[in-house]
């Protein structure tokens, strides 16, 4: 079995009355304050999809580079973020299955201005020693989208959709213009919920391009995910 992890929500910094900026993750309209170590772990997964081993390695590296006192264990912060719904995981027999179980129930949120996010990512890579200063230009450049990715961005910009809803609607060639269309076209049975939709979909080769396009948009920092 393979387990994949990612972070959900959007990072914002809010100033206190004393003028200090504190990190907040906004997920489905709720604000969550993060400790320094929680932010460190959450940022390891922002726009990344990692196995547990990869995540622990990334977190350990950033802890080594971090100044000041060390916190509690990696597992402690992973559990805290998971309980608060800011880190999610998906388990499957194959990479595709695990990826779908990871993303299926998450709502796709298109990002308008992605330059600050790309810059933040470059700074992280630079501090980790992954890239040099001369490589900033290449990493800051916005990657072109494929036709499939453009279609997904346009649809997600019009209607709030989960990955499972998007995969199902595109597979069945449903025309979605608004929220009502989602309910009418995809939730045709009284017992159908967004979670049963995730559970009922059996990923096969015709759906791979859609799932891959969604993952690429996320890794290229053009979308983020929120929980329902």
Question: Residues of each region from the PLM?
Answer:
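N-terminal leader segment of winged-helix/HTH proteins
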Residues: 1-18, 88-89
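Short amphipathic alpha-helical surface micro-motifs
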Residues: 6, 14-15, 24, 69-70, ...
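Short, flexible segments with low predicted structural confidence
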Residues: 12-13, 26-30, 137-139
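A short, structured beta-strand/loop element
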Residues: 20-25, 29, 34
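Long, charge-rich, low-complexity alpha-helical segments
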Residues: 32-228
């Amino acid at each position: 079995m393979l387990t994949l992890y990612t972070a959900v929500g959007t990072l914002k910094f809010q100033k206190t009355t004393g003028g200090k900026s504190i990190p907040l993750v906004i997920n489905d309209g709720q604000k969550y304050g993060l400790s320094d170590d929680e932010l460190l772990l959450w940022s390891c997964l922002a726009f990344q999809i990692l196995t547990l081993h990869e995540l622990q390695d990334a977190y350990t590296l950033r802890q080594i580079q971090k100044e000041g006192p060390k916190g509690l264990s990696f597992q402690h912060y992973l559990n805290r973020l998971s309980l608060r719904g800011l880190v999610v995981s998906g388990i499957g027999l194959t990479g595709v299955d695990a990826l779908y179980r990871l993303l299926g129930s998450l709502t796709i949120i298109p990002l308008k201005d992605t330059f600050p996010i790309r810059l933040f990512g470059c700074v992280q890579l630079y501090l980790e020693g992954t890239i040099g200063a001369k490589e900033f230009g290449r990493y800051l450049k916005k990657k072109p989208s494929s036709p499939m990715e453009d279609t997904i961005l346009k649809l997600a910009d019009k209607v709030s959709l989960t990955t499972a809803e998007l995969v199902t609607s595109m597979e069945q060639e449903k025309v979605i213009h608004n929220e009502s269309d989602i309910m009418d076209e995809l939730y045709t049975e009284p017992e159908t919920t967004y979670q049963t939709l995730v559970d009922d979909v059996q990923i096969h080769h015709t759906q791979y391009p859609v799932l891959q396009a969604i993952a690429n948009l996320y890794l290229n920092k053009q979308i983020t995910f929120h929980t329902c």
